Each structure stands twice: as structure tokens, then as C-alpha cells.
A protein has these predicted regions:
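N-terminal subdomain of lithium-sensitive/metallo-dependent phosphomonoesterases centered on the IMPase/IPPase/PAP
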Residues: 4-7, 26, 30-138
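Short linear segments in intrinsically disordered or otherwise low-structure-confidence regions
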Residues: 9-11, 19
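Residue-level signal for inorganic ion chemistry
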Residues: 73, 108, 141, 170, ...
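Structured N-terminal alpha/beta-domain signature
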Residues: 97-102, 116-119, 136-151, 171, ...
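DPxDG-like acidic metal-binding loop motif
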Residues: 127-183
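Short strand-turn-strand beta-turns centered on an Asx-Gly dipeptide
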Residues: 188-189
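An extended, acidic
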Residues: 195-313
Length: 313
């Protein structure tokens, strides 16, 4: 039996989950699990009755989709894309997004024809009931344009405001990180676990920056939080995108990540990765995090309370 944190609309709850195996077809370690999760070895994106697919089946095909989209974006990567106006920037961003979305949307829609589709990856807040695909076809898109390596393709299936599966693909390294509710988080076959660091003063922490159109109060809050962490943590990293920071928290490479406001596509993939890797999620004041929260904190259990204390000053 494994106790897992599951994200609900208004709070987190702890649920005992049994799973017998999750196929190595999409890179998950299976020997740690006992129970009922299985995946058809013959499932293909076409020819599968979506109503019969398990969440493990869906994750396997979601991985296939994000890898295909990532390959298309990798072919567009290399030279710095120059732009002289905001309009030129937006066109360049849209070209990348449309390229990946043209691959992702039909594939994911075939998997769950009745699932909703979040049209704007920058939207935040709670979703209506039911299933929704929350996708960022080029997370870290500006980095891609500047020939920087920190970008990814993400797809998350949300059910009644709980992320149930996510796939994050890093096209430049070929790595794929996955999480399935109750079955852990994995990076290319290796099960992930957050760090065991117990001293914020020895911790590497990270945050993202405010969006260009963000409210001034949020911008000031971001600045104040960075100042506070510079005093208390060992190293403070500030860059985008959020999901890559959260992947690093899940992998134990860094110890905490926080953000103010934030879009669903920024936070939901990483929230599932971190919770399935044994991390703690809350807002920056230590209250249960929900998509309605105005702040977000993901941390290793040993430094979570210290991070809350620092960010609450």
C-alpha cells in the first residue's frame, strides 16, 4: 500500500492506492507496485475504444503525443529568432505553439473525445466539472526562440479539477517525465523522489518570474519573496518555465519552488509530479493549494515549513 496526495478542488486528501503494475512501455518502474493498474500492450492511438482505456493506457498514448510534438519543435530549434516588435514576437510564439498543437490536439481528442480543451494555456483558476486536457504545446516558448534549452511540451488530463496523469517531454535531451495518480512519478524508467534535505539554508530553491502583463502588486510580491529567500536559502534560481523547476523538485535536484498566481498549464503538471514523488504542496502560507489559490509552493517535506516561514514574512 502506498499513501499518495491527491489534489482536489478545495483541498488535498490522502488516499491508499494499490497498483499491480504500470507497463514499462512508457518508462515506468513496475516492481514497486502491487494491485490493479494495467496497460494493454497492444493499444494504439487509433483503433482503441476510448471508453475502455485505463488511465495507464491514456498516459502511454499521451507520452507518444508529446514526443511527436516535441520532435516537430526540435526541428524548428537552433538559430535565435529575431523580432523587433511585440507583434513579431507574438507571431513567432504562435508559430511554435500552432506547430505542436496541430499534433497534440487531434491525438489527445481521439483519446478522450468528450474531454474539454483549455483553449488558453495562460488561463488560471478552477475548471468546470468533468475531464479537461490542459496542454502547453511549447512551455518556455521564449527560451525556444532564443535558442535556450529550457523548454518542454506538456499534456495533463484533469478530472473534476484533479490532475490524474501528466507527461512532460524535453525534446533536446529526449527525456520524458510522467506521473499517474497513485502510481508515482518517473523519469525515463527511474522512479522519482523529492530530496531529503531538512535545512533551508542548505537548499537550492527556485521561482518563476511574473508575466509581462501581471498586476503590479504581484510583481512586487515576487520581488519581496526573492529577497526573503536570498537571505534564507543557499541558492535561488529565477527563470522560466515553471514545470521544469517542478520536475527538478520531483527529482530531488532542487528543494522547493514557489510562484504567485500562475496559469493551470504552469502548475498542474508539476503539482502532480511533485505530489507523486513525495513532496508537499500548499500556498506560500501553508494552506492547501487549489487552482483558485493566489500562490503556490512545492517543497521537500523537510524544508516545507521553513519555506512557508520565509515566504510568509
Amino acid at each position: 500500500m502506498h499513501l499518495k496526495l491527491l489534489m482536489g478542488l478545495d483541498t488535498f486528501e490522502t488516499r491508499a492506492v494499490d497498483s499491480e503494475r504500470v507497463s514499462a512501455r512508457f518508462g515506468l518502474i513496475t516492481s514497486d507496485f502491487t494491485g490493479e493498474f494495467t496497460m494493454s500492450e497492444t493499444m494504439q492511438t487509433t483503433g482503441v475504444d476510448a471508453s475502455d482505456a485505463t488511465d495507464a493506457d491514456l498516459l502511454g498514448q499521451t507520452v507518444t503525443a508529446v514526443r511527436a510534438a516535441g520532435s516537430a519543435l526540435r526541428e524548428r530549434f537552433g538559430e535565435v529568432v529575431r523580432y523587433r516588435t511585440r507583434e513579431e514576437l507574438m507571431r513567432a510564439l504562435a508559430a511554435n505553439g500552432d506547430t505542436a498543437l496541430g499534433i497534440l490536439r487531434p491525438r489527445l481528442t481521439r483519446l478522450r473525445p468528450d474531454a474539454g480543451w483549455v483553449e488558453d494555456e495562460l488561463d488560471g483558476g478552477a475548471l468546470p466539472p468533468g475531464e479537461w486536457w490542459v496542454v502547453d504545446p511549447a512551455e518556455g516558448n521564449v527560451n525556444h526562440l532564443h535558442a535556450l534549452p529550457e523548454w518542454a511540451v506538456t499534456a495533463t488530463l484533469v478530472r473534476d479539477n484533479r490532475p490524474v496523469l501528466t507527461a512532460v517531454h524535453l525534446p533536446l535531451t529526449g527525456e520524458t517525465c510522467t506521473a499517474l495518480t497513485g502510481a508515482g512519478a518517473h523519469l525515463d524508467g527511474r522512479r522519482l523522489h523529492v530530496s531529503r534535505t531538512a535545512d533551508l539554508g542548505l537548499s537550492v530553491v527556485a521561482t518563476s518570474q511574473a508575466r509581462p502583463d501581471e498586476d503590479e502588486a504581484v510583481v512586487r510580491r515576487v520581488g519581496a519573496s526573492i529577497t526573503a529567500m536570498l537571505s534564507d536559502a543557499l541558492v535561488v534560481r529565477t527563470t522560466v518555465p515553471a514545470t521544469l523547476h517542478l520536475l527538478n523538485v520531483a527529482a530531488g535536484r532542487i528543494d522547493a519552488f514557489w510562484q504567485f498566481a500562475g496559469a493551470r498549464a504552469d502548475l498542474l503538471p508539476g503539482a502532480l509530479l511533485v505530489s507523486e514523488a513525495g513532496g508537499r504542496l500548499s500556498d506560500v502560507e501553508g494552506r492547501p493549494w487549489t487552482p483558485r489559490s493566489d500562490s503556490f509552493l512545492a517543497a521537500a517535506p523537510g524544508v516545507h515549513a521553513q519555506a512557508v516561514a520565509t515566504l510568509s514574512r
